[in-house]
Amino acid sequence: MISRLTGKLVEKNPPQIVIDVNGVGYEADVSMQTFYNLPPVGESVQLFTQLIIREDAHLLFGFATAEERKTFRQLIKVSGIGAKTALGILSAMTADELAQAVAEEDVKRLSSAPGIGKKTAERMVLELRGKLVAHAVTDGLFAAAPAADETEDIVGTLLALGYSEREAKAAVKGVPKGTDVGEGVRLALKNLLK
C-alpha cells in the first residue's frame, strides 16, 4: 500500500495532481480542500494517500492531512458511497464540518454535498455516528483536540458504551484534567446521569 508521498508537484489539473517521487510520477485525485492548499507547481509537497484497487484500475487518492484521509476511509465504508463520492463530500466540506454535521444529524447540510441525497445523508448519520471526531471549535459542542490522552480515552470509552459523541464530550468537560481514565469514566458517567 502507498501510504504517503513526498516529492515535487509537477501537475495540477483539478481534481488530479501528479507528484514526481525520484523520477516516478504518481497521479492522485485530491479533494478541492487539499487542492487549494497545494504549493505551486515545481515545489515540494507531501500527501497522505489511499490506494484503491479495482478490477479495472488502481486509484490513488491524496489528502493534505492524516485526519482527512481517516475521514475518507470512514466515508467509503458507508453503504452507497464510493471513492469518488467520498472525495466530492470532502471537496464540499472539511473533515471537521462533516464530523459536526454527522454529530448534529444535519441531513440538510450533508445532502448539500454532490451526489448525496436525503436517504444517503440519513444513512451517513446512522453509519458514521461516533466514528468522526471534530477538532475545530465551533459552537461549544466540540473541544479543540483533546488536551490529554486520558480525555481522548475517556471519550472513546463512552462512545464504546453507546453514548453519542456530543454526550461524551459534554460529560468529559466536567472531569478535572489529569484524572486517570478509570476515574474519569466514572465521573463522566455520573455527569451523564445527572
UniProtKB/Swiss-Prot annotation:
UniProt subcellular location: Cytoplasm
An example Gene Ontology CC term for this record: Holliday junction helicase complex
GO biological process: one example: DNA recombination
Alphabetized SUPFAM superfamilies for the sequence: DNA helicase RuvA subunit, C-terminal domain, Nucleic acid-binding proteins, RuvA domain 2-like
Superkingdom classification of source: Bacteria
Region (Flexible linker): 144-147
Name listed for the protein in its UniProt record: Holliday junction branch migration complex subunit RuvA
Naturally occurring in which organism (per UniProt): Neisseria meningitidis serogroup C / serotype 2a (strain ATCC 700532 / DSM 15464 / FAM18)
Gene this protein is translated from: ruvA
